């Protein structure tokens, strides 16, 4: 089993820890929690770069090794990093439990060293008709991010 972790932080008080596990060539399970969010839906994505020199802005676009359009996690046409939305309750906490086959921890398309980002607004899953729907899901600003690193 391969394990990874991302510790999320931001200047806006949003923070959390996200864990990734993968058995063999199976899907990757993503668990954890993020606090300090406004209640409601927030876009949740793996971004291409593990660079936080300019905060979450320098993490680049959604991780997209197959050059597809933005979509929902269940869509065939989606970025590998499109993990949909997480839901923050009235307490501002989002508990995450996602399983996805397009974010491996090993091999040529591994997400190790890339970043996970939580956005300010809901991801419209590419179906919102906004000019940004097919690239970002119109999910708004980046409120927290962390670099995905191997865990022992």
Swiss-Prot record:
GO-annotated cellular components: cytoplasm
Cofactor note: Binds 1 copper ion per subunit. Binds 1 zinc ion per subunit.
Class in the EC hierarchy, top level: oxidoreductase
Residues reported in the UniProt entry to bind Zn(2+): 62, 70, 79, 82
Gene3D superfamilies, alphabetized: Superoxide dismutase, copper/zinc binding domain
Annotated keywords: Antioxidant, Copper, Cytoplasm, Disulfide bond, Metal-binding, Oxidoreductase, Zinc
GO MF annotation, one: superoxide dismutase activity
Protein name, entry field: Superoxide dismutase [Cu-Zn] 4A
Annotated gene: SODCC.3
């Amino acid at each position: 089993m391969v394990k990874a972790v991302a510790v999320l932080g931001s200047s806006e008080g949003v923070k959390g820890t996200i864990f990734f596990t993968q058995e063999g060539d199976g899907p990757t399970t993503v668990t954890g929690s993020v606090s300090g969010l406004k209640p409601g839906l927030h876009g949740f994505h793996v971004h291409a770069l593990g660079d936080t020199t300019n905060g979450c802005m320098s993490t680049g676009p959604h991780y997209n090794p197959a050059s597809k359009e933005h979509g929902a996690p269940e869509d065939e046409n989606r970025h590998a990093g499109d993990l949909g939305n997480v839901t923050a309750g009235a307490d501002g906490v989002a508990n995450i439990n996602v399983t996805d086959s397009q974010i491996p921890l090993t091999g040529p398309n591994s997400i190790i060293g890339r970043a996970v980002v939580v956005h300010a607004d809901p991801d419209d899953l590419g179906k919102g008709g906004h000019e940004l729907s097919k690239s970002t899901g119109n999910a708004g600003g980046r409120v927290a991010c962390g670099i995905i690193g191997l865990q022992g």
